[in-house]
């Protein structure tokens, strides 16, 4: 779907669910997230479509508790967390039916632009592996094919969900040592 607001509205008239999986570069979030959110909410309001967003765990802050749930507070103790919290608040306050399927860092069987391949294993041929933190601490991961199936099931059941549904995707929690 085009990033232009008028184009999104006309194209969205043909759909029941808008999947907003656009992810600009982190350095562009401050500028891009607000207008992208406005464009998607405008299109959803104009057509009655539900918005489905693959969410992340940034909202919970830097010091995650051992177990996350919908009741885990959104801390906003770093810039990316605050930006995601603001984006999600815009969906909640704009009267748009929204489903956030919240998961850890993405992993997949196919090459792509994700943290696992772009950072962790980018230099594995040289015998180097990077890890997002101490290797003895758990890190959350979402296997994309499984998360996509969960998103599809949620979209099919959107009529039974609340106006703003924040749903955790269980995924995997592994240490670097594991």
Can you say where each PLM-predicted feature lies in the sequence?
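A generic structural signal for well-ordered alpha-helical segments
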Residues: 44, 91, 123-124
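Amphipathic alpha-helical segments in well-structured domains
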Residues: 33, 37-38, 84, 116-121
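Mid/C-terminal beta-alpha module of Rossmann-like enzyme folds, strongest
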Residues: 150-178
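NAD(P)-dependent short-chain dehydrogenase/reductase
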Residues: 104-139
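Conserved Rossmann-fold NAD(P)-dependent oxidoreductase catalytic core, especially the SDR/UDP-sugar
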Residues: 20, 24, 37-85, 99
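A conserved structural motif in NAD(P)-dependent oxidoreductases
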Residues: 142-147
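Conserved beta-loop-beta element that borders a ligand/cofactor-binding pocket
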Residues: 56, 89-110
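NAD(P)H-binding glycine-rich loop region in Rossmannoid oxidoreductase-like domains
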Residues: 1-47
């Amino acid at each position: 779907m085009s990033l232009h607001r008028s184009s999104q509205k006309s194209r969205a008239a043909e759909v029941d669910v808008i999947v907003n999986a656009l992810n600009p570069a982190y350095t562009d979030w401050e500028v891009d997230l607000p207008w992208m959110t406005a464009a998607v909410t405008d299109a959803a309001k104009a057509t009655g479509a539900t918005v489905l967003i693959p969410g992340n765990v940034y909202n919970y802050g830097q010091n995650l508790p051992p177990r996350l749930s919908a009741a885990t507070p959104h801390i906003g103790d770093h810039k990316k967390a605050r930006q995601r919290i603001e984006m999600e608040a815009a969906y909640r306050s704009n009267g748009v039916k929204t489903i956030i399927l919240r998961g850890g860092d993405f992993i997949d069987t196919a090459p792509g632009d994700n943290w696992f391949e772009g950072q962790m294993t980018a230099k594995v041929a040289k015998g180097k592996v990077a890890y997002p933190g101490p290797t003895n601490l758990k890190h959350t991961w979402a296997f994309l094919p499984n998360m996509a199936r969960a998103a599809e099931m949620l979209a099919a059941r959107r009529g039974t969900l609340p106006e703003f549904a924040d749903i955790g995707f269980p995924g995997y929690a592994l240490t670097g040592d594991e």
